[in-house]
Amino acid sequence: MTADTQTPVTKVDQAPPLLIKKLSDKARLPTRGSAFAAGYDIYASKETTIPARGKGLVETDISMAVPAGTYGRIAPRSGLAAKNFIDVGAGVIDADYRGQVKVLLFNHSDVDFVVNEGDRVAQLVLERIYTPEVVEVEQLEESVRGAGGFGSTGVGSGVGEQMKN
């Protein structure tokens, strides 16, 4: 390959593009709220009501191809969670998935929540993924934590506990 046929890199940290296909005229491309935003806002393509204490799938009318070596994580938008008790569930977009992206919303409030066409309902965060070979072993190397599970490391800073001793 000669220098004439190489694709120019305009930035040192230039990443491969996120490819989006609109499935209808109501679809909107994901957008970032600021230059340093980690996620891309995902938009509803039609009105959907999420029942009180219930769940619902919100259509986006987009499909995508995430860059090689990444997956897409559908994450909550902080404003929806803080103001309306709306959370996002089950949101992994694998590199080989090409179907419509839908957003599973949980309504933890006592009133129905209406998602309007064009509302930002979640954010898409692209994360690098490492998929090593699975190897079964007879024993694992010991660690300081050991098998301690939920709550085993405590909730405080540990400073008070150290001062008591």
UniProtKB/Swiss-Prot annotation:
It is an enzyme of class 3 (hydrolase). GO terms for molecular function: dUTP diphosphatase activity; magnesium ion binding. GO terms for biological process: dUMP biosynthetic process; dUTP catabolic process. Keywords: Hydrolase, Magnesium, Metal-binding, Nucleotide metabolism. Its EC number is 3.6.1.23. Pathway: Pyrimidine metabolism; dUMP biosynthesis; dUMP from dCTP (dUTP route): step 2/2. It holds the Pfam family dUTPase. Belongs to the dUTPase family. PANTHER family: DEOXYURIDINE 5'-TRIPHOSPHATE NUCLEOTIDOHYDROLASE. NCBIfam families: dut (TIGR00576), PRK00601.1 (NF001862). This is Deoxyuridine 5'-triphosphate nucleotidohydrolase. It comes from Neurospora crassa (strain ATCC 24698 / 74-OR23-1A / CBS 708.71 / DSM 1257 / FGSC 987). The lineage of its organism: Eukaryota, Fungi, Dikarya, Ascomycota, Pezizomycotina.
